[in-house]
């Protein structure tokens, strides 16, 4: 859980990382108390490891079509002061737009996602740190808090006079997609848990595996999403402003702006043989925070999930531990299922 330090595995992106610029607006209120949405007052040393994880958010399915749009409403327990930091940010940057990403998706809809480059967005920075170790009750509280924040933010952006007019007008024309998540009030029922626990197996994927030693003897698929971590904390700076810490902006190829392809090794989804022999882990894989920031996306999980299913079937057929299946036959079976295993 959390982030390895920079020296621990020789990863240049590890630990606390400050790729975003500090914001020179007051982040404190009465008696210099941090405003809501500030997670701390101590600036972590660059490269220091800790328990923190990247922010969670909801992926919103939105629409601008009046015939398929449900307007944002004032949520229960709404307090506009929770978004005072947004007010001050917009006052300092009145030409700023909507603070989250909108991606066109089929059906004339929009996918609303936390903006990795935004200073403030739909991600509730710093309020998910205890999720990995939490029980069901605490996880539900975290889920509820994220929903409350998100619904409140959408309403705030649409109605608060401190929000620039161009943003309020755009928000008035946006709404939840009427034909999505109807049983849940058109709000997505699943929280986007970008990162939680990670396994430590016999092979531990690191930054070097993503960017340098990209070929492996036991590939189960190809990953290519850039190393991409969202904010882990938002801190008051010594001058009273704030800085977001933890974002790793995507490292892309210079040629086509895409991620760098690398082989995903089978060993990264198998536990240590001394600990467990009948488990495959294609999501919370054996990887550092930095490496996981690349492999943590659905295309990679689908590839690893299918390969894990085939491996599980072979372990049963061969009556052996998952670590000991016949790798030659495994590779051939993956190819019959059209898994891409080579970089060329």
Predicted regions and their residues:
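Flavin (FAD/FMN)-binding glycine-rich loop and adjacent Rossmann-like elements that form
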Residues: 1-344
């Amino acid at each position: 859980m959390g982030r390895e330090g920079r020296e621990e595995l020789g990863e240049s992106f590890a630990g606390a990382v400050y790729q975003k610029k500090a914001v020179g607006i007051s982040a404190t209120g009465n008696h210099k108390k941090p405003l809501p949405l500030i997670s701390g007052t101590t600036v972590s040393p660059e490269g220091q490891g800790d328990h923190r994880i990247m922010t969670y958010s909801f992926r919103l399915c939105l629409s601008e079509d009046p015939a398929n749009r449900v307007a944002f409403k004032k949520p229960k327990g709404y307090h506009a002061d929770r978004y005072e930091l947004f007010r001050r940010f917009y006052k300092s940057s009145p030409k700023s737009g909507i603070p989250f990403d909108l991606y066109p998706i089929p059906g004339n809809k929009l996918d609303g996602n936390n903006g990795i480059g935004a200073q403030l967005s739909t991600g509730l920075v710093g309020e998910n740190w205890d999720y990995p170790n939490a029980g069901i009750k605490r996880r539900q509280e975290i889920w509820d808090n994220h929903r409350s924040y998100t619904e409140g933010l959408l309403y705030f952006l649409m109605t608060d006079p401190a929000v620039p007019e161009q943003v309020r007008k755009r928000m008035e024309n946006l709404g939840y997609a009427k034909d999505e998540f109807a049983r849940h009030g058109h709000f997505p029922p699943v929280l986007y848990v970008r990162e939680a626990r990670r396994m430590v197996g016999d092979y531990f994927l690191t930054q070097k595996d993503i960017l340098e030693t990209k070929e492996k003897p036991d590939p189960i698929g190809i990953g290519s999403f850039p190393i991409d971590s969202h904010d882990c904390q938002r801190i008051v700076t010594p001058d009273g402003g704030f800085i977001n810490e933890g974002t790793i902006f995507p490292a892309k190829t210079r040629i086509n702006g895409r991620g760098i392809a690398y082989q995903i090794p089978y060993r990264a989804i198998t536990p240590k043989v001394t600990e467990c022999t009948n488990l495959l882990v294609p999501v919370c894989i054996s990887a550092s925070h930095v490496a996981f920031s690349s492999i943590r996306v659905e295309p990679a999980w689908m590839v690893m999930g299918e390969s894990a299913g085939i491996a599980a079937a072979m372990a049963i057929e061969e009556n052996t531990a998952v670590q000991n299946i016949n790798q030659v036959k495994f590779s051939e079976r993956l190819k019959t299922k059209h898994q891409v295993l080579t970089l060329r």
